[in-house]
Amino acid sequence: MLNPQLNRHGELIHLLSTEGLPRRIIEQILDLAATFVPAPGQEFPKLPLLHGKSVFNLFFENSTRTRTTFEIAAKRLSADVVNLNIAASSTSKGESLLDTIANLSAMQADLFVVRHGASGAPYLIAQHVAPHVHVINAGDGRHAHPTQALLDMYTIRHHKGDFNQLTVAIVGDVLHSRVARSDIHALTTLGVPEVRVVAPATLLPEGLAQMGVRVCTDMEEGLRDADVVIMLRLQNERMRGALLPSAHEYFKHYGLTQARLALARPDAIVMHPGPMNRGVEIASEVADSGQAVILDQVTFGIAVRMAAMSLVAGVRP
């Protein structure tokens, strides 16, 4: 089966999901990102790699961090950036998604960064753009968020070096989390021997065992001796029905406190894709501790998105 993310030479042309993404491509993105990360106290480099190219940020769902970091990344690569106000756009007036893409392509778009509430929307767009136009998925429904997963992998590699002896715990609302799915695919591809998914039964999707993870409904069991703890927020906006008694009850059983973190390895790192709900999935004492590398994730996210845009466009330093 052909991989829609790669051309016939096996080169990355769209970044749609970490599922099916070869290890060599993931490592290529991480290695290139490392060349973009500034030294402490320095700014991100300004490079001419996408000079003359137009990057269209199409966010059909609200976002602050992701849209902003994509915009910064594109500008650091000297691209022209267009941020489309979807709420005021023609899609809200009845124009189809593909008609919108066709019209924007006629404006000489070279790269679409797409966030959409419908799973698979970036795939659909990638199937209908011209060969010289590229698509990066910035999050689609519950399905995938590949650049978040890649910046998570970069953060883990930066702090832990190797993947092949790690135990990684992903904790929280896995049912609604595209980040969890993308992280699981990336972690297993990179050879992490034990990936644990920790959540109440009502927030666990079906089919996790087939993804090669260990499922835990007990927080203490899931955290014990973990090297990396990735916390997920409760996505109340995607919940239908009473999946949880209350946020207070959730924190009581699944919130990451200092006492619970002590079950992990002493040098464990704590990650979170943001935005954080302090006092719901994570205690402030943990979020503000030396073990939390959440702000590193934000910084590395710019470099990883610079790398992803460069590679899909077929350019590199």
From Swiss-Prot:
Name of the protein in its database record: Aspartate carbamoyltransferase catalytic subunit
Sorted UniProt keywords: Pyrimidine biosynthesis, Transferase
Entry similarity comment: Belongs to the aspartate/ornithine carbamoyltransferase superfamily. ATCase family.
Main function: Catalyzes the condensation of carbamoyl phosphate and aspartate to form carbamoyl aspartate and inorganic phosphate, the committed step in the de novo pyrimidine nucleotide biosynthesis pathway.
InterPro entries: Asp/Orn_carbamoyltranf_P-bd (IPR006132), Asp/Orn_carbamoylTrfase (IPR006130), Asp/Orn_carbamoylTrfase_sf (IPR036901), Asp_carbamoyltransf (IPR002082), Asp_carbamoyltransf_Asp/Orn-bd (IPR006131)
Positions of L-aspartate binding: K93, R178, R233
Molecular function per GO: amino acid binding; aspartate carbamoyltransferase activity
Pathway annotation from the record: Pyrimidine metabolism; UMP biosynthesis via de novo pathway; (S)-dihydroorotate from bicarbonate: step 2/3
GO CC aspect terms: cytosol
Catalytic reactions on record: carbamoyl phosphate + L-aspartate = N-carbamoyl-L-aspartate + phosphate + H(+)
Enzyme class per UniProt: transferase
PROSITE patterns cross-referenced by the UniProt entry: CARBAMOYLTRANSFERASE
Name of a matching Pfam family: OTCace_N
Annotated positions binding carbamoyl phosphate: R65, T66, R115, H145, Q148, G274, P275
Gene3D superfamilies assigned to the protein according to its UniProt record, in alphabetical order: Aspartate/ornithine carbamoyltransferase
Subunit structure: Heterododecamer (2C3:3R2) of six catalytic PyrB chains organized as two trimers (C3), and six regulatory PyrI chains organized as three dimers (R2).
Gene Ontology terms describing biological process: 'de novo' pyrimidine nucleobase biosynthetic process; 'de novo' UMP biosynthetic process; amino acid metabolic process
Gene: pyrB
SUPFAM superfamilies: Aspartate/ornithine carbamoyltransferase
EC number: 2.1.3.2
